[in-house]
Amino acid sequence: MFFAVRVERGGPWDWSRDLREQDGFDEHARFMDALVDEGFIVLGGPLEGGREILHAISASSEEDVRTRLAEDNWAQNGMLTVKSVEPWTVLLDGRAD
């Protein structure tokens, strides 16, 4: 099952610094890369303006999505907050098998 997930930056996010210069970036990047490697995060990236991030996630339930994303160090310190998790029926998929 797929979910469209919106995450918002905030809390201790330092808007004067680049993404890769934020506190705890290396740990966050390792965590997110592992979710991609597992096939949990299919696609993801910031939306226009940079405050929100959109992820396409493959998971069994909304609870699974929220539980897994809550393990991120940036979620734990308030830099990222899950704003919405919506079931998504994918009808078009151009990714190669």
Region spans (language model):
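Conserved, structured core segments of small domains
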Residues: 1-97
